[in-house]
Design a protein with these regions (language model features):
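Glycine-enriched loop-and-adjacent helix/strand subsegments that border the catalytic/binding cleft
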Residues: 70-133
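N-terminal non-catalytic cap/leader segment that marks the start of a structured domain
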Residues: 1-95
Length: 133
């Protein structure tokens, strides 16, 4: 199952990508994908649905961030030796853990706002996943 959120910024709705590559609306089963409902109970409920019976989203204008109101955004720096080498840094012996503002999470095609006075913006992409109980 591949879940996503679609719609205007701040008004995203939950959806699923079905086995035929069509995006289907999940709003009648879950209000959104956020900390309060990303859990095993919700997943079990969603696994019972025949997604092909759900309304198809044909006028998809935007895919939003994967989750609404995440609690934390934890990053690991220089986690690839190639990236460390290209920055001229030593490969760390232990992970470099850092936090990022959750407001920086965007949809896959959203603009990325670079602060006006930024002097050292790194182009690297962060890979994220949601961890829960």
């Amino acid at each position: 199952m591949k879940f996503l959120r679609y719609g205007i910024k701040g008004g995203e709705k939950p959806a699923v990508l079905d086995k035929n590559g069509k995006i289907r609306n999940l709003s009648s089963y879950v209000s959104d994908f956020g900390p309060e409902n990303i859990n095993l109970d919700t997943l079990a409920k969603l696994q019972k649905i025949d997604f092909e019976t759900l309304p198809e989203i044909s006028n998809l204008s935007r895919i939003g961030p994967c989750i609404v109101k995440p609690g934390k955004f934890v990053g690991i720096g220089l986690n690839y030796s190639d990236h460390a080498a290209e920055t001229g840094a030593e490969v760390p012996t232990e992970p470099i853990v850092f936090m990022k503002a959750t407001s920086c999470i965007t949809g896959p095609n959203d603009n990325i706002v670079i602060p006006k006075n930024s002097k050292k913006t790194d182009w690297e992409v962060e890979i994220a996943f949601v961890v829960g109980k």
